[in-house]
Design a protein with these regions (language model features):
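Alpha-helical cap/lid subdomain in secreted, periplasmic
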Residues: 27, 54, 64, 80-216
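Serine-esterase "nucleophile elbow" of acetyl-processing enzymes
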Residues: 24-74, 84-92
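Bacterial N-terminal signal peptides that target proteins for export
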Residues: 1-11
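N-terminal helical cap/lid subdomain that shapes the substrate entry/recognition surface
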Residues: 75-79
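N-terminal signal peptide c-region/cleavage motif recognized by signal peptidases
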Residues: 20-22
Length: 216
């Protein structure tokens, strides 16, 4: 009888521990990292107005428990991103929103080089079991049609090759509206960021759902 009582007590304790552990895992917010350049960093904006901050607030307003670290660096290129990817996105990150290439295009860097760097980052994240949401960029018109034809398809091609969700153009809805831009006519203002968040939300929400399904 004593053995049965001890065994029963042991089972109760184990069940309680497992239940508590499961609840703790369920309560843990999804941890994302926004990894990119000035468009991700929030150039000349207060930290609370950046894309990552506004996106986190919008997701939480919909009841989605998430934290989004801002690993955007103004002026960063794909080669700069590749050099810092491992330490900017720590192990244990649930997912990374990868946005780089705008400065490559502005500087006329070879699209083939940009694609190679982005692919190396994607492969590195995947080897660390960190899901990737890829954010697309388009070459500015002043770079010419030939450059655009080589640069613009990069993101779709990488998304298809690596099975990634893709948000095709980060500045969709902003790039042609000066009221949503800073005076430099290159970077979004606070209202512009809000438009970017609104337009990208469905893609980000689907990405988070995929992360949740993979963690079960």
């Amino acid at each position: 009888m004593r053995f049965k009582a001890v065994a029963a007590q042991f089972i109760v304790i184990c069940t309680a521990v497992l239940t508590a552990s499961f609840a703790q895992a369920q309560d843990k917010p999804v941890q994302l990292v926004g990894f990119g350049d000035s468009l991700m960093a929030g150039y000349q904006l207060p930290p609370t107005d950046s894309y990552t901050a506004q996106l986190e607030a919008a997701l939480k307003a919909k009841g989605i428990d998430v934290t989004i670290a801002n690993a955007g660096v103004s002026g960063d290129t794909s080669s700069g991103g590749l050099a810092r990817a491992e330490w900017s996105v720590p192990d244990g990150t649930d997912g990374v929103i990868l946005e780089l290439g705008a400065n490559d295009a502005l500087r006329g860097i070879s699209p083939e080089e940009t694609e190679k760097n982005l692919e190396a980052m994607i492969s590195g994240f995947q080897k660390r079991n960190i899901p990737v949401l890829l954010i697309g960029i388009m070459a500015p018109p002043n770079m010419g049609d030939d450059y655009a034809k080589r640069f613009n398809p990069i993101y779709q091609r990488l998304a298809e090759k690596h099975g990634l969700p893709l948000y095709p153009f980060f500045l969709d809805g902003v790039v042609l509206d000066e009221s949503l831009q800073l005076e430099d006519r290159m970077h979004p203002n606070t209202k512009g960021i809000a438009v970017m968040v609104e337009k990208s939300m469905p893609t980000v929400e689907a990405f988070i759902k995929t992360i949740g399904a993979q963690k079960k």
